[in-house]
A protein has these predicted regions:
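Short, glycine-/aromatic-enriched active-site segment of Class I SAM-dependent methyltransferases
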Residues: 133-154
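A short glycine-rich, Lys/Arg-flanked "PGG" loop and its adjoining helix->strand segment in the class I
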Residues: 43, 111-126
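A short acidic, Gly/Pro-enriched loop at the edge of an enzyme's catalytic core
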Residues: 23, 75-76, 86-97
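Conserved alpha-helix/loop element of class I SAM-dependent methyltransferases that forms part
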Residues: 1-26, 37-40, 44
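Conserved SAM-binding loop
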Residues: 64-65
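Conserved SAM/SAH-binding beta-strand->alpha-helix loop
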Residues: 57-59
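Short alpha-helix
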Residues: 156-170
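C-terminal lobe and adjacent flexible extensions of AdoMet/dcAdoMet transferase-like proteins
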Residues: 170-228
Length: 228
């Protein structure tokens, strides 16, 4: 795996590991960051497949392109787009799989992001998502600070019940939780010190302590069923 991709990864899971990606698939990675999941997906889809990485930060797109080159995959069908996740400008029914690794919780309009994922998927296409949710509510002022000082996979996280409601209201069915993990204090501290502080500064120690035992990483898949 290219070092640039590993150094810039803020992921909380490995969605390509449970997405059942097959040779020839078209995969779109929401919030591709430094490109780690794009590289992994490209190996799985093979020369006949296609991978598109979407990210809102031009700096990350450039680093993801570097990761693809370092992995020797520059001749594969890999594309990067600098755009918001809810405005990919990809055609309807474009992808077999949409992946995302601890990014959607950072988006202010999660409904629009999941609606966009649903739109670009083919019938029987699937999402494979790793993300962060809250197992307990936290104080509004603390939540607000997360959105401005904690990009380490936590800013914008919402209660788990609200998260599943968002996924289903976008049209997805057969939601299957692959894994759930309550983050330990050590993991929370690691997120606070994760790469990317040139974009967002880390939170205070007091804020980290305040959310201990309330933050969960989830991995799940869901299906876009064909119209009857």
């Amino acid at each position: 795996m290219p070092e640039v991709a590993l150094n810039l990864s803020r992921g909380c899971g490995n969605p390509t590991g449970f997405a059942n990606i097959r040779p020839g698939d078209v995969v779109v990675d929401f919030g591709c960051g430094g490109g780690i999941d794009v590289v992994l997906a490209a190996h799985k889809v093979g020369p006949q497949g296609r991978v598109v990485g979407i990210d809102g930060a031009p700096q990350m797109i450039e680093r993801a392109k570097q990761a693809v080159a370092e992995a020797g995959l520059q001749d594969r069908n890999i594309e990067f787009r600098n755009s918001y996740l809810n405005k990919t400008q990809l055609p309807d029914g474009f992808a077999d799989v949409v992946t995302s690794n601890c990014v959607i919780n950072l988006c202010p309009d999660k409904d629009a992001v999941y609606e966009e994922a649903f739109r670009i998927l083919r019938p029987n296409g699937r999402i494979a998502i790793s993300d962060i949710v809250l197992s307990e509510n936290i104080a509004p002022e603390l939540q607000e600070r997360f959105q401005t000082t904690w990009a380490g996979c936590l800013g914008g996280a919402i209660p788990e019940e609200d998260y599943w409601r968002t996924v289903r209201q976008a049209g997805f069915a057969e939601v299957q939780i692959v894994a759930r993990h309550l983050l330990t204090p050590e993991e929370l501290e690691g997120m606070a010190c994760c790469p990317g502080e040139e974009f967002t500064p880390p939170p205070s120690k007091e804020d980290r302590v305040a959310v201990e035992g309330k933050v969960t990483s989830v991995k799940f898949i869901a299906i876009k069923l064909p119209l009857k």
